[in-house]
Amino acid sequence: MQSLLAIADPTRRRIVELLAVRERTAGELVKEFDMSAPAISQHLNVLREAGLVTTRAEGQSRIQTLNPAGLDDVDAWLEKTRSVWSHRLDALERELRAEDERNARKKKKSSS
């Protein structure tokens, strides 16, 4: 669940979104934000530790790449949560329909 904690931060979510489009250097990422290179580096470290980002050396540059498999635990959690809410919403819908039917019967009885 470390990846879910990592993307709880809006800056890290935005980094993930940017890397989903294409890989970038840390310098390119710094230009996207109003923060220092060390601050972006700290965010990248959190994303790397969570398995969301990989870094490779290319000459003098460090290329940051999104690791989609790092989002698997987030996807699994969302699926589980979605399933729970789907069941709850289905039960609520059934209860509301039953309530509507009861009210319609009461109204019909009182108007007879």
Residue ranges: model-predicted function:
Residues 38-39, 60:
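A composition/secondary-structure signal for short, hydrophobic, low-basic-content segments
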Residues 13-15:
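Pre-recognition alpha-helix immediately N-terminal to the DNA-recognition helix
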Residues 2, 18-32, 37, 49, ...:
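C-terminal regulatory/oligomerization modules of transcriptional regulators
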Residues 6-11:
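Short helix-coil-helix linker/hinge
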Residues 45, 55-57:
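A broad helix-preferring feature
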Residues 57-63:
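Short, Lys/Arg-rich nucleic-acid/phosphate-binding segment
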Residues 17, 42-45:
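Base-recognition residues in the alpha-helical recognition helix of bacterial helix-turn-helix
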